[in-house]
A protein has these predicted regions:
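C-terminal cap of metal-dependent C-N hydrolases
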Residues: 45, 344, 433-439, 445, ...
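Divalent-metal coordination cores built from histidine and acidic residues
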Residues: 86-88, 92-93, 97, 103-214, ...
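Bacterial N-terminal signal peptides that target proteins for export
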Residues: 3-23
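Acidic, glycine-enriched loop/beta-strand segments at the rims
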Residues: 47-59, 418-426, 430-431, 479-489, ...
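Active-site neighborhoods of metal-dependent hydrolases
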Residues: 159-162, 167-194, 198-221, 232, ...
Length: 571
């Protein structure tokens, strides 16, 4: 069997025939008084099919990698699973995964699979391919606690390598607009030449034919910040004929949030592509009132025919690096050039002044946080700096006896990285308002980690361990922002439809058997900012492509994950 899953807009003819034959076979056997055999039968569960409709009590049968019967199943399963008192739903889809490196270290995908995530979708601005020689060398140099050989050149090569190593979840990726830009322009703050842009478009087309899901951008950071709207339109003009989606970390989530949303809509309108906003938020208390206008703006665009969606992580803090506290101009040329400039006294004075001064020319998450006491340092490469892990920027500045701005610059230089950083910038009421919109799905914006080994060297955002369980526990059960059936839809059929995944995201005959069995009364996130390495609770069993990966709350060791190819893939 191929490790690649065909993801056409509708089930393939062969898939429909298999289901048709299974139904005929079931009817024949029942008429004859016999019982068909299945690989797995899940019995007496409360079935949430992903559609948002009210649940029904029933059974579900699996043969091979697919669901073949839903309702009352008379036949026996080689494995019989009693789901009495439990919810049974499609596997959850992580629309914004940074499991790129963590899956190379540990293919079990523990922090996500223990929440019921069965598909990791990567590619926010940066993707693991295609790689120029320069970018490949940079990736090697920037590796931190997780070390790995780079044996691939293309995005497809990377995804293939994951499956060859073994992964418990399915995997997919957008091609990163930042990756494409670095391959052809480097870190220069300029527009591409006509020849460079043509080469960039060709690279996008190749990635789409290899199975990319579209183009992902991350416009707050250098060098993506240097790309103007026409460049992004050109990349999407290359991806759109393949059914590609444009998905973006907006150019601004603060002072110019509304203008940034307009830019995304312009790209969608000019290319005819659907578009999604990564981790929609209004960053910084001064900008929180803008969210109501943004939501209304998106509703209006959708009513006018644009297919605009968004995803969120359900926490009041974001996580990125100290680069988000410094102006983009100082970062031109990449990390080495950035660190060198930060050692020039005149440059340091200018950067420090700009770090302290509000502006709408670039996005400062340090200023959006309101105070360095609301900025937490979460990950270092250098062992000498690891004792600062989990401390606030204000506390570290006090320990070092330097200003907040000087401390941030010194840490970037000494660590050899942008330094993992958590910023408290998001309004709780806005999270609830966003979740009430039927076009909002969920993404962790984090790696898929484990509470052991190399992962314990960092103090990650708890969203890595809790985003999906938090939606079902806090926002569904406790706060009643969503019904359970709607909460399930947001994490299953909605992202599947946005990604054009015809056979995932639903409990229906012919769908791949990505299935979660969980207790609605007990599911919850346990990870905190103080103690992030804690798995969610309440998920009992998880199946991926018909194989049981979690049994009674314990990982089975199985790694049946596949590459989920985009709609333009040529096999």
């Amino acid at each position: 069997m191929s490790v690649f899953a065909s993801e056409d807009r509708s089930p393939s003819i062969s898939a429909r025939r298999r289901v048709h034959h299974a139904v005929i076979g079931l009817a024949t056997l029942l008429a004859c008084g016999g019982s068909p055999e299945y690989d797995v039968v899940i019995r007496n569960g409360t079935l949430y099919d992903g559609s948002g409709r009210a649940p029904v009590a029933g059974d579900l049968a699996i043969a091979g990698d697919s669901i073949v019967a839903v309702g009352t199943v008379a036949g026996r399963g080689r494995l019989e699973v009693d789901a009495t008192g439990y919810a049974v739903s499609p596997g959850f889809i992580n629309m914004l995964s940074w499991a790129n490196e963590s899956l190379l270290e540990d293919g079990r995908s523990m922090s996500d699979i223990m929440q019921g995530v069965t598909l990791e979708v990567m590619g926010e601005g940066e993707s693991m391919g295609p790689l120029s020689d320069t970018l490949r060398a940079d990736m090697r140099a920037q590796q931190g606690d997780i070390r790995y050989p780079i044996t691939w050149r293309t995005l497809r090569g990377y995804l293939d390598s994951l499956v060859a190593r073994g992964v418990s979840t399915n995997v997919a990726s957008f091609i990163g607009a930042t990756t494409v830009r670095i391959n052809h322009i480097g870190w220069d703050d300029r527009a591409p030449t006509a020849a460079e842009l043509a080469a960039m478009q060709a690279e996008v087309r190749q990635a789409m034919e290899e199975g990319a899901r579209g183009v992902g951008s991350s416009l707050i950071y250098a060098p993506a910040f240097y790309a103007k709207t026409p460049e992004l339109v050109a990349l999407m003009q290359a991806a759109a004929p393949y059914g590609g989606m444009y998905i973006s970390h907006l150019r601004s989530e603060g002072a110019r949030l509304e203008e940034a949303v307009d830019e995304l809509m312009t790209i969608a309108r000019e290319t005819g592509a659907r578009a999604e906003i990564y981790h929609l938020k209004a960053a910084g208390e001064a900008n929180w009132p803008k969210m109501a206008r943004v939501l209304a703006r998106i509703d209006s665009a959708r009513a006018a025919g644009l297919e605009i969606t968004a995803d969120i992580y359900p926490y009041t803090a974001g996580a990125t690096g100290l680069d988000a506290a410094m102006p983009p101009w100082v970062q031109e040329g990449g990390y080495a050039a950035w660190a060198k400039r930060l050692q020039d006294p005149a440059v340091r004075r200018k950067v420090a002044e700009e770090m302290r001064t509000p502006t709408d020319q670039w996005e400062s998450l340090l200023l959006a946080s309101g105070s360095p006491d609301r900025v937490v340092l979460s990950g270092f490469k250098a062992d000498s700096l690891k004792p600062y892990t989990g401390k606030t920027l204000a506390a570290v500045a006090a320990l070092r006896g330097t200003s907040v701005e000087e401390t941030a610059m010194d840490l970037v230089i000494k660590d050899g990285s942008r330094v993992g950083t958590i910023y408290f910038i998001i309004d709780e009421d806005n999270i609830a308002a966003q979740l009430r919109k039927p076009w909002v799905s969920v993404g962790s914006d984090a790696g898929s980690l484990a509470s052991e080994g190399v992962f314990l060297k960092s103090s990650p955002h708890p969203r890595a361990y809790g985003s999906f369980a938090r939606v079902l526990g806090k926002y569904v059960r406790d706060d009643t922002v969503l019904t359970l059936e709607e909460g399930v839809r947001r994490m299953t059929s909605l992202p599947a439809a946005n990604l054009r995944l015809a056979r995932r995201g639903t409990l229906a005959p012919g769908s791949f058997a990505d299935i979660v069995i969980f207790n609605p009364a007990t599911i919850r996130d346990n990870a905190t900012f103080e103690q992030p390495h804690q798995y969610a609770s309440g998920v009992r069993d998880v199946f991926v492509n018909g194989v049981q990966v979690v049994r009674n709350g314990e990982h089975t060791g199985a790694k049946p994950g596949r590459v989920v190819l985009g709609p333009g893939a040529r096999r």
